[in-house]
Amino acid sequence: MNAPAEHANLARQHLIDPEICIRCNTCEEICPVDAITHDSRNYVVKFETCNGCLACISPCPTGAIDSWRNVDKATPHSLADQYSWDYLPDTTELDQFEATVMGAAELPAEVQQITEVATAGQGGPAMAPWSASHPYVNLYTPANPITATVTGNYRLTAEDASSDIHHIVLDFGTTPFPVLEGQSIGIIPPGVDEKGKPHLLRMYSVASPRDGERPHYNNLSLTVKRVVEDHEGNPTRGVASNYVCDLKKGDKVQVTGPYGSTYLMPNHPGSSIMMICTGTGSAPMRAMTERRRRRMDRKEGGELVLFFGARAPEELPYFGPLQKLPKEFIDINFAFSRVPGEPKRYVQDAIRERADKVFQMLQDDNCYIYICGLKGMEAGVLEAFRDICRAKGADWDALRPQLLSKARFHVETY
């Protein structure tokens, strides 16, 4: 996604924090494009040379190298500026916008198109929460993908369920692939289409937290539904989804990304998260929930409330594991629309049933709302918010812009 027009000349400048740099020379030695140099005071990064490859990030013993500021492409921080610093310059209003590293590849057209569709419900991409971690974006492109190895693939839904949803684990070995909760990756199916052209990449949300599906491993997981019919119910075969669902342990996969710099979770203690999803829209919610679960012992506070819709329990990804989570950790509200003998119940119905709680969270500046799933769910969820606000004497149409301006409202529907 590009910056707004008035900020179209933004670039993400890579810098080194002089306060914590120990001048060990590791970054300069490892940089493959000679973008790092130094004088007697500071180590600095050449703006016009750095391509954002991140080869220097992991080896740095202090983390000084992992510093970034948004700047105008025409007036970046010069080498003379950097040599003179005792500490990094303060962040500015420019740092709230999305920007790419100068010299880094542009986002693939299909990624931009999918993102525009997914975020249309909120009026375009929102800002990331103020406490979100810095995301790395577009490190690997269709022209230069990374190869991952499949280390796991198992079906999440029952064998007799109408939806065939798989949990896929990909390992990147020793090659850096930093990813955050809420980000996506691209997978390039092998072969060519009917016109003889390579298949386009397909984006999938990451379903694991930043430290890996297996903690402290360089891997991640995906939640993928096998596509066997189109939106009208006509038989079709999704090229990418069938390829991914059929992967075997040990198979090699071409991956691009990561993608996404705004659909990110808050990190500050006391922050709450309301999650609303259907089907494979549960992937980013699982990532955020697992991130919080692994940090439960820190007692950082903040609530997790989940509204999760599916046709039936056997078609709901992660239904079993979700039921085992402590109720004091997460407040789960299921909605099933195709259970025999039961009335149809959709995710917006579950939201209305929790009107008091939902309104409380909408009013809480420390609560962040995330919606992900089918495009068809979006209108019903927003109407439920509107009805709840109206019943409480508030105006949803006035509240939503406030949520967006505070980076508290995030929508990705397809």
Swiss-Prot record:
Keyword DNA repair carried by entry: no
Entries under CDD domains matching the protein: CYPOR_like_FNR
Signal peptide range in chain numbering: none
Top-level EC class: oxidoreductase
Reaction catalyzed: benzoyl-CoA + NADPH + O2 + H(+) = 2,3-epoxy-2,3-dihydrobenzoyl-CoA + NADP(+) + H2O
One example of a Gene Ontology biological process annotation: catabolic process
Stimuli inducing this protein: By benzoate.
Protein name, per record: Benzoyl-CoA oxygenase component A
Native species: Aromatoleum evansii
